[in-house]
Amino acid sequence: MNFHLYLAYLSISFFTIVSPGAAILLAINNGLYYDLKAVLISSVANIIGLFILSVIAMIGISSILLISHNFLIGLKIIGAIYLIYLGIKQIINKNTKIFLKKNHTHSEYNKIHIFRKGFFIAITNPKPILFFSAIFPLFLDKTKDINLQFFLMTFSFMFISLCSLMTYGFLSKTAKAWFLKEKSLKLFYKISGFLFILMGIGMLYL
């Protein structure tokens, strides 16, 4: 894979991952309710789910790419539209409140329940499914080993996801007051939304 293309992929992956979603809200809540170990458990469960989704998506993509090169162009357009859609969705997002049941940290929790919840959120989240199906093909070089590129992009995505979730979990412990401010979350939504739209427009020129 071309190095500059890989950097572009990392950039899109980063902004896709750090945008607020179910997995991030779970990491924040686990950090607020429990501790960083709970955040780690749910985060590991999440990236395992992401790997399974990427494998399923890649099997279908690889088969299609061998048949039709024009399909790649179609996916490129879909991928760009998807990024723009995410941007608009982020900007108009109204779900900016994190509700806490109690105002203290729980020292005891069910680790299996934490893991299961993180895994379930990952495999039922449409965002990574659409990402792996629509964004992956944009960066694949048919002249090189598809499997090698797949593992490189997948594990890069998983690594960024793990770091992102752990960071949100850590920040929820150290900056609890900030995360509970609706204005702060609204600003974050708008900034990430505009970045998605810009990336979607730029994707059409790759």
Model-derived features: where do they sit?
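Juxtamembrane transmembrane-helix termini in multi-pass membrane transport proteins
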Residues: 3-73, 134-153
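Residue-level hotspots within the lipid-embedded alpha helices of multi-pass solute transporters
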Residues: 13-17, 122, 126, 158-166
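Selective transmembrane alpha-helices of multi-pass membrane proteins
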Residues: 66-98, 161-171, 176-206
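Selected transmembrane alpha-helices and immediately adjacent juxtamembrane segments
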Residues: 111, 116-118, 123-128
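Short alpha-helical transmembrane interface motifs in multi-pass membrane proteins
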Residues: 7-12, 81-84, 117-120, 156-157
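Membrane helix-loop-helix hairpins that form the core translocation module of multi-pass transporters
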Residues: 37-113, 171
